[in-house]
Amino acid sequence: MSIIPCTTWVKKGVASTNPAKIQLTPKELNQIIKHKQPELTPPVENDSDKKHNKVKKQKSEVGSSEIDEYNFDKYDDESGNIHCNIGNIASFEEDGTDPLITGEDDDSEKDDDIIKSNDNLVLIGRVEGGGSILEVFVYNQDEDSFYCHHDILLPSFPLCIEWLDFDPSDSKPGNLCAIGDMTSIIQVWDLDLMDSLEPAYKLGRKPNKKRSQSYIGHRDAVLDLAWNKHYTHVLASASADHTVQLWDLEIGAPANKFTSFEEEIQTIKWHPNEGHYLLTGCADTLVRLFDCRYETVVKSWDALGEVEKVLWNSFDTNYCLVSTSNGYVQYIDIRKDKSIWNVHAHTKEVIGLSLSSSCPGLLVTSANDGVIKVWDIINNKEPWFIWEKKTNLGALLCLAPNPDNPFVFAVGGDNKSHNYKIFDLLEIPEVRERFRERKLQSNINDTRTQEEKEEMMDVTEDKNSTIFNLNTTNTPSKRTKRNK
């Protein structure tokens, strides 16, 4: 088995130019290996795991013999397949040297360690056999380069990745990512550290009878994560346990829990401008909009199937998109009770739903049918189909837009030998012709009138309700050291 269940990008200029390397003595390394070995042993799957296992999305079998009409294979030739498991780490010699390293790093390898200001990082959750890895790739379009910078061993099958800059132990913005997996624990990793074997910190705790410890956080797999860019100490998590948790990263504990769901919550997204609104999509076929200040559902809409993804139209925040398990994409005006349009976009679950970072109307969808499609939704009344391709990546499990280039998207699938690509859509004549003259703009554009904003905020204010009632809508003024 070799699959890519999740991926995301890191903006240019965020990562440290020279990431620090963790230096461990042989004794320290052996102690960590012994401690981590049980965590990294694949658990026996029970009936509950099978029910919630998102790998069910990979049932499609897509042939890989298709001719690549646009020669997209060149974008991921360097990605390869990594077979890595902490149980197979080589033993170090007594002098601390690695027996697998026979010489000093050459200049080219040292240059590859340096992250340039025009480099993007690409975060890839990969599962190889019984092992799980977070791969940190460097992508530079100007230099036509895409290579693995470093990787991190993960304790469980990764289901979602979310980048964030909040480090509770540092007053400066960091470069971290939160990972949700088949366990109930969220791990937050420092991306500016190489060779790290432990996360920066964890969110959640499993019960321990010997220590008289009860659950903290979720009780089942974490299916999606959403970091709040306005209240940067807030992270939302959606779970197979039928709850959404809001975490206060300052103290590393849940501050609120929403339980209005009949099934697992598969997708969540914060409003681009109003940081207290959270959009959720559930397997019970309902899309819900929460006002997190009051822990209430402001509005809800019926979907045409189990909700796979929700997405705000950041170019016009009156609207959001929904994709479903039976292949539909729906477009919703949040001021209305029903969707504006529905299109049967794919034959299977639409797992990928992404808008361009700065080209209005450019929508990309991908699904378990192995097909990626491009649409134009600049006209809110109906979508225009522009282009499609049946890839050789297998069932498509994740899709992510480049935050700096409006036409670059990353896609991951479950084809054992070929499961990751970066697409430059300007290479496609139909897409280039449709969008090349369109004026680019920031994808955060609040077009609502003051009256419309007030209409969505008609709940009586309670200043003591949640973590959103702070003196500032950004980072708390003082951060305290905490146990990691």
Stretch-by-stretch model annotation:
Residues 147-149, 197-200, 255-256, 296-299, ...:
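A structural motif specific to WD40 beta-propellers
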Residues 129-134, 183-187, 220-223, 241-245, ...:
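Short coil/turn segments within WD40 beta-propeller repeats
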Residues 140, 192-194, 249-252, 292-295, ...:
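Short loop/turn segments that connect beta-strands within beta-propeller blades
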Residues 153-158, 203-222, 258-265, 272-273, ...:
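WD40/WD-repeat beta-propeller blade N-cap
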Residues 169-223, 235:
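Eukaryotic helix-linker segments that join adjacent hydrophobic helices
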Residues 1-121, 130, 349, 378-484:
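Terminal intrinsically disordered, low-complexity extensions flanking WD-repeat/beta-propeller proteins
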Residues 117-118, 162-174, 225-232, 238, ...:
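Loop/turn segments within WD40 beta-propeller blades
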Residues 95-135, 150-178:
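Beta-strand-rich domains and repeat architectures in extracellular enzymes and scaffolds
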